[in-house]
């Protein structure tokens, strides 16, 4: 753990989305002592704050910005994705860049730093 009191620092990608915003809310409710970093590119989600957590505008395709934002995270809950069938069909290149390239960036960060990666998809 990165903090002095051994409480985890949890980062959530896709935090402004339907699932991500609920996950952040649950973490805040059941583990208010944890440090939470929330990030999203605001492609579809529009939550700018969740409880007392500000959602940072970060695109997971930008490795440098992602690394700077995730710095210090012990766990990354990777919930960012282009998931709608229509979006994936109409914007196939974007879906690939986010779902494959962006996920690769998150995994790269976790490998580099030793952070755990939770990827439920």
Q: What does each model-found stretch correspond to?
A:
Residues 85-101:
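Short alpha-helical oligomerization interface
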Residues 42-43, 61, 83, 101:
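Adenine-nucleotide cofactor-binding loop residues
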Residues 54-75:
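Conserved Rossmann-fold cofactor-binding substructure of NAD(P)-dependent oxidoreductases
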Residues 80-83, 121:
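Conserved NAD(P)H cofactor-binding loop of Rossmann-fold oxidoreductase domains
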